[in-house]
Amino acid sequence: LCKHHSSEQVNLYIMDFSSESLRVFAEAPQVGEVMVSGDDEKITNLFKLLQQEMNDRRQLFAAYGGDIQSYIRESGNNISNIVVVINNFAAFLEQYEEHEENIIYFTREGTKYGIYFVVTAVNTNDIRYRILQNFNQMYVLQLNDSSDYANVLGNVNGTYPSKYKGRGIFKDDQVYEFQ
């Protein structure tokens, strides 16, 4: 996203609850903030910002069909997409369970306003169904049990990632492998 999109096109907010290696993106002009465990005030403020942005965009888009694509097409104006990254969702939820309802709301309603979430998890059951159902696209890296692929993606027609590090699969019209 940082390589192919300007800060006028996308704004990233990154919460890293794993190795904190995503701090490397902190200086990118598209990144508003990189937050880690213990950044309580920053995380609370992010959810306030997202709520305000959602309210503002709801009003702004109302005269143009109510969604970001219609607004851009009909008004001729551009507005940046907002992408929130949560690396290691289970650790995030363990520390900030009070924000779970916010996550459910933003992942369900946010896409029409240009607010998107990218969430990582170590185990297939780290993300509760109430949240998981709000994601249209999932990418799965190596899992221990082949039945876990179907638990996440549905029927994978016997397609599993090669046993090379970094390989995974995702499902669109069919199942694809990626590196």
Q: Where on the chain are the PLM-derived regions?
A:
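P-loop NTPase catalytic phosphate-binding loop
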Residues: 1-67, 73-147, 151, 159-160
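P-loop/Walker A phosphate-binding loop and immediately adjacent motor/lid segment at beta-alpha junctions
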Residues: 154-168
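Polar low-complexity intrinsically disordered regions enriched in Ser/Thr and small residues
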Residues: 68-69, 169
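Conserved P-loop NTPase motor module
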Residues: 95, 99-101, 165-179
